[in-house]
Amino acid sequence: LGVESDNLPGFVVITSVSKGTTCGQIFYDFYWGSGFLPSRYQGVKFRGGGSPVLYVENPDGMTAALKRGLLDDIGKINRLKYQRVQDPEIETRIAQYEMAYRMQTGVPELTDLSEEPQHVLDLYGPQVKEQGTFAYNCLMARRLIERGTRYVQVMHAGWDQHNSIS
């Protein structure tokens, strides 16, 4: 599939947070794993609450330059290991670290709805600004696709009567 964006992954899974839903559906990470394909094809999970991606923000006291230097050093170590063992998963790890670094600029821009026109927000319903709702996740899916993500899977619990089937 590839990716058209430098700052966002090619495959994203967005999970919802359903208040009051006790449907028993659990979204295990292996649902969007790469299976028999190399791990570089697995999905990146965007959470339904809080920061969409854990650890995208720099911790207190960590500057962008310091983080870049740390990432460069980790990359050097990983490349040395790759030269020794030729394991393609090491290349994937290097690419994942780089993507995580670039997502620090891509994700905040993605989730900033201040420039989204009100008439567009209205199309998604009254809960569109509530993080973790189906409306919000559909809006995020559209914004991801507009920014070059090739495949977005929206996982929403309780939509099909699993909670009241009797």
Q: Can you name each region flagged by the protein language model?
A:
Residues 1-166:
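Ligand-binding pockets and gating/stacking loops
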